[in-house]
């Protein structure tokens, strides 16, 4: 096994074609991390000119100290059953990490637990410290240990049928409601950033500046690995559909009124009256929208990412308006179809815990992601290879305890 000097294109081609490859190991992803103080170096090993394993090493300085952390996010990309390859990658990574004054090498490979027994054994034998099998969104990990993934290598009907029953109904209703899903461009990021701001205010989280999303789009869009989707409500075509629905409902009511007014018919009349009422309310709302925003308004948006045959729902945002149109359901289905048409076989919804309690802060995420025909992808987790034991102990053990103590004292002082 030997060190190899390969191009970015060769690195990315290997990552995209390998079953353990991941978006975070693409060379262009490293470009997106520069804004937050990370820089990168790449390594590769192989034999007889054939690449056997690669790693994109991210480095970040420790505040006030002349040291760095070496982080191989969702790497190394290699066969974890092949100890010789792992040993060669670790040896090369240690060489580079020591050159960058790293106190540790942290990895969190895209290897699932049910296929990871040999990987765990090999990594431990090579000297890696396993961070344990904690909850998927544990704060002890940089990346989620668990994600929810939908297999999308199926027909449209099969895909919808794979969703949970109530979600199937919502998707079908969203398609009927007539919103328009657009694959947008860089200009659309302004709309997306505004929707993200609205989402953050509604759901109580801090949002990124538009430059963050521009950075991701600029780095990955050219190679087809980042796409922006927006959902628009255009009042005129939707109004036409609503008017047709109203006509059909009124005709149905007239037909029911001509029948014998038994209990069954009266119940049906009551149902149709409720439908007519809702349709009239919808018509009124859309008429007002046509006056104020004749070109329509954007209701939601998302970034869809790719790494070979894997696709990722990375960031999503939505307006507070016209939520009954279910724009997010329409968007998710269209993004899955787009991903499938562009070679993806899986659609990753991102991090989750496994069946959290209803009072957990992560319950809502899990509840949303579980209805899309997903399975739980549980990774083997995070591993550290320690290069500087005293500094590792300080950064990984002492500093977090001090931070928790400061927070505790601050809360007590505020309570006085």
Swiss-Prot record:
UniProt keywords, alphabetically: Acyltransferase, Cell shape, Cell wall biogenesis/degradation, Cytoplasm, Peptidoglycan synthesis, Transferase
Family, according to the entry, reads as follows: Belongs to the FemABX family.
Q: Which parts pass through the membrane?
A: none
Q: Name one GO cellular component term.
A: cytoplasm
Name of the protein described by the UniProt record: Lipid II:glycine glycyltransferase
Give the EC number.
Answer: 2.3.2.16
PROSITE patterns assigned to the protein according to its UniProt record, in alphabetical order: FEMABX
Q: Which gene encodes it?
A: femX
Q: What does this protein do?
A: Catalyzes the incorporation of amino acid(s) into the interchain peptide bridge of peptidoglycan, using aminoacyl-tRNA as amino acid donor.
Q: What is its main location?
A: cytoplasm
Q: Name one GO biological process term.
A: cell wall organization
């Amino acid at each position: 096994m030997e060190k190899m000097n390969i191009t970015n294109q060769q690195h990315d081609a290997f990552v995209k074609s390998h079953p353990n490859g991941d978006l975070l190991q693409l060379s262009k992803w490293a470009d997106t991390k520069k804004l937050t103080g990370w820089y990168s170096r790449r390594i590769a090993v192989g034999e007889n000119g054939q690449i056997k394993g690669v790693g994109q090493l991210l480095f970040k300085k420790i505040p006030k100290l002349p040291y760095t952390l070496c982080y191989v996010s969702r790497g190394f990309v290699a066969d974890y059953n092949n100890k010789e390859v792992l040993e060669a990658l670790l040896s090369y990574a240690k060489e580079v990490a020591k050159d960058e004054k790293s106190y540790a090498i942290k990895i969190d490979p895209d290897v699932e637990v049910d296929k990871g027994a040999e990987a765990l054994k090999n990594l431990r034998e090579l000297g890696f410290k396993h961070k344990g099998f904690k909850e998927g969104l544990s704060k002890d990990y940089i990346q989620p240990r668990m994600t929810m993934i939908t297999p999308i290598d199926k027909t449209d009907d099969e895909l919808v049928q794979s969703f949970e029953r109530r979600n199937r109904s919502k998707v079908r209703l969203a398609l009927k409601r007539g919103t328009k899903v657009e694959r947008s461009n860089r200009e659309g990021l302004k709309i997306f950033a505004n929707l993200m701001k609205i989402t953050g205010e509604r759901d109580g989280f801090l949002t990124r500046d538009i430059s963050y999303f521009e950075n991701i789009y600029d780095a990955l869009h050219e190679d087809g690995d980042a796409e922006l989707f927006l959902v628009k409500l255009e009042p005129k075509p939707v109004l036409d559909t609503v008017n047709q629905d109203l006509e059909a409902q009124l005709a149905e009511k007239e037909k029911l009124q001509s029948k014998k007014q038994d209990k069954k018919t009266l119940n049906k009349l009551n149902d149709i009256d409720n439908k007519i009422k809702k349709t009239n309310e919808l018509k009124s709302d859309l008429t007002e929208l046509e006056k104020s925003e004749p070109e329509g308004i954007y209701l939601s948006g998302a970034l869809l990412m790719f790494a070979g045959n894997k696709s990722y729902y990375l960031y999503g945002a939505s307006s507070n308006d016209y939520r009954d149109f279910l724009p997010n359901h329409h968007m998710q289905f269209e993004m899955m179809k787009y991903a499938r048409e562009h070679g993806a076989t899986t659609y990753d919804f991102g991090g989750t815990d496994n069946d959290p309690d209803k009072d957990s802060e992560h319950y809502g995420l899990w509840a949303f992601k579980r209805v899309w025909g997903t399975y739980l992808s549980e990774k083997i987790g995070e591993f550290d290879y320690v290069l500087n034991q005293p500094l590792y102990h300080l950064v990984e053990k002492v500093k977090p305890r001090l931070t928790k103590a400061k927070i505790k004292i601050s809360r007590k002082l505020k309570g006085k």
